[in-house]
């Protein structure tokens, strides 16, 4: 009997501990401001062979599932090799869309425009992702006659089965900037995103043939490596300025390789790693761009596991947190590697909890981008379910970028409830504001029960983030006799949030 009493007591204490841990987890991960992105790539061929309807259905399904998992921003690849998944006067249609470079989709559609519309309907941002310098991947056998490397072969060089637009030629850089300005000016994108491809990744036995360009365009720089870095620096600054001159609210983001420099290369600030380096191998001086404000956000690709011998995840997230905090810092996360790597303390679970904990401990980390979206929607290793039920259980707004604009729009107007045969709908009118900096583009709807403090900093009270000027109350939320308060705020282009306006209803 005594043993049973002790057993029950232990069981009770265990349940209390588990309950406390669960409450602690939800409290810990309830950030109202958090960039929760996912990359949707085409270069892997996942859409090749699909009809227009099949691809749209596939993307719509992915977006629905990603929203359920808490994702609030999509980074969609639209230019993998100087081609286009959108209508372009500069570049041919992508073979990763239609199977043949230069061939338009049939039935005709514009994937970028469609994705912008679909993301905005779901309250998500859409960032157009381009590969700036890569002109041909290894698997592409034929380029269209309208491709830049065919029309102007002098602007590109061959390297390890690829074609690369030469960063050392001003006309090549200008061409990419013109392509970006065309995208930003014609499409309602929330961001323009480039990845880690600048100068090509080093390959054994390969040489970048740019002696002639170095001789012609060195601008007094005597060291070729410094000159190459300067070429990329000039490009990044030029691109940043072009984007913000075209549309000041469009965010410019970069997702570089995860190591800036190893300690052996830079004793002062190098990380305790031994992998390939942005600065030395790709000629990408990420910290210069961040510190000079030439990017709006940086997403280092930390695709390794905690405990990796050459590139330890924990070492690197702490390094980036320390040195790259002058602009928004998000972490590029490899979903599959995370769930396949056992936790170092408890090998019966994967590394997702440990990595999430590290994210929350870093004061400069303001978000995550998941590589890649399909791994989340396929729920590999239960990753998507854990986001939905634990880490991203409640919705989040993307972080503010006060260095672009920090002024919030005015309150919404004329809130009212109307009853229809199929339910009750809350309507409101947008606040007055015509300029991009004060015009409302989205709204946040919160719900509070009678007697509850109105606290819009609590994301668990968010019931919708929408571009509509109405919210239909679900039948499950209507309980006769109960009184609820609905609160609506307005968001501008940069997710600055207005003061709340509330309206009560008794069912």
PLM feature segments, named:
Residues 33, 41, 45-53, 57, ...:
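Active-site-adjacent "subsite" loops/lids of carbohydrate-active enzymes
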Residues 57-84, 186-189, 288, 294:
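Catalytic domains of carbohydrate-active enzymes, especially glycoside hydrolases
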Residues 70-106:
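Aromatic-lined carbohydrate-binding/catalytic grooves of carbohydrate-active enzymes
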Residues 84-99, 134-160, 196-219, 264-275:
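Aromatic- and acidic-residue-enriched segments that line the glycan-binding/catalytic groove
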Residues 171, 175-179, 185-194, 198-272, ...:
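Active-site neighborhood of glycoside hydrolase catalytic domains
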Residues 283-309, 325-403:
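Substrate-binding cleft of secreted/luminal carbohydrate-active enzymes
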Residues 382-438, 495-507:
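Pro/Thr/Ser/Gly-rich low-complexity, intrinsically disordered linker/stalk tracts
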Residues 475-498:
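Beta-strand-rich modules
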């Amino acid at each position: 009997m005594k043993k049973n009493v002790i057993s029950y007591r232990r069981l009770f204490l265990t349940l209390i501990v588990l309950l406390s841990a669960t409450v602690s987890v939800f409290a810990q991960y309830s950030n109202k401001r958090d960039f929760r992105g996912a990359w949707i790539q085409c270069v892997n061929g996942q859409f090749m062979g699909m009809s227009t309807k099949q691809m749209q259905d596939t993307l719509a399904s992915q977006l629905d599932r990603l929203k359920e998992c808490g994702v609030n921003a999509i980074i969609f690849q639209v230019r993998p090799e100087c081609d286009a998944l959108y209508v372009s006067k500069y570049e041919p249609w992508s073979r990763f869309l239609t199977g043949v470079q230069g061939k338009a989709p049939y039935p005709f559609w514009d994937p970028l425009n469609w994705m912008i519309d679909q993301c905005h309907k779901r309250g998500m941002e859409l960032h157009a992702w381009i590969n700036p310098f890569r002109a041909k991947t290894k698997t592409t056998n034929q380029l269209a006659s309208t491709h830049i490397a065919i029309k102007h072969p002098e602007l590109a060089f061959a390297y390890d089965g690829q074609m690369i637009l030469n960063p050392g030629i001003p006309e090549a850089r200008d061409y990419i900037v013109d392509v970006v300005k065309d995208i930003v000016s014609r499409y309602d994108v929330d961001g323009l995103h480039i990845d880690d491809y600048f100068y090509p990744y080093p390959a054994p036995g390969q040489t970048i043939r740019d002696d002639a360009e170095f001789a012609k365009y060195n601008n007094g720089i005597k060291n070729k490596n410094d000159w190459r870095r300067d070429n990329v620096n000039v490009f990044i600054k030029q691109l940043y300025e072009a984007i913000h001159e075209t549309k000041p609210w469009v965010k410019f983001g970069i997702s570089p390789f995860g190591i800036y420099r190893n300690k052996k290369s830079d004793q002062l600030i190098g990380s305790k790693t031994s992998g390939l380096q942005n600065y030395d191998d790709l000629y990408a001086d990420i910290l210069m761009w961040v510190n000079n404000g030439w990017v709006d956000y940086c997403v280092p690709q930390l695709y390794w596991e905690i405990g990796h011998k050459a590139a330890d995840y924990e070492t690197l997230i702490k390094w980036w947190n320390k040195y790259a905090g002058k602009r928004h810092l998000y972490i590029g996360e490899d979903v599959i590697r995370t769930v396949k790597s056992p936790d170092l303390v408890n090998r019966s679970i994967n590394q997702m909890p440990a990595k999430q904990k590290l994210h929350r401990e870093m004061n400069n980390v303001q978000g995550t981008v998941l590589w890649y979206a399909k791994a989340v929607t396929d729920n590999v290793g239960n990753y998507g379910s854990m986001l939905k039920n634990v880490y991203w259980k409640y919705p989040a707004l993307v972080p503010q970028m006060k260095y672009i604009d920090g002024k919030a729009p005015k309150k919404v107007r004329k809130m009212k409830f109307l009853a229809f045969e199929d339910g009750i709908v809350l309507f409101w009118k947008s606040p007055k504001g015509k300029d991009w900096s004060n015009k409302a583009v989205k709204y946040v709807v919160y719900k509070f029960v009678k007697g509850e403090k109105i606290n819009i900093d609590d994301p668990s009270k968010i019931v919708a983030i929408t571009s509509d000027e109405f919210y239909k109350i679900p039948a499950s939320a209507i309980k006769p006799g109960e009184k609820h308060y609905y609160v609506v705020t307005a968001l501008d282009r940069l997710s600055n949030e207005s003061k709340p306006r509330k309206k009560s209803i008794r069912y």
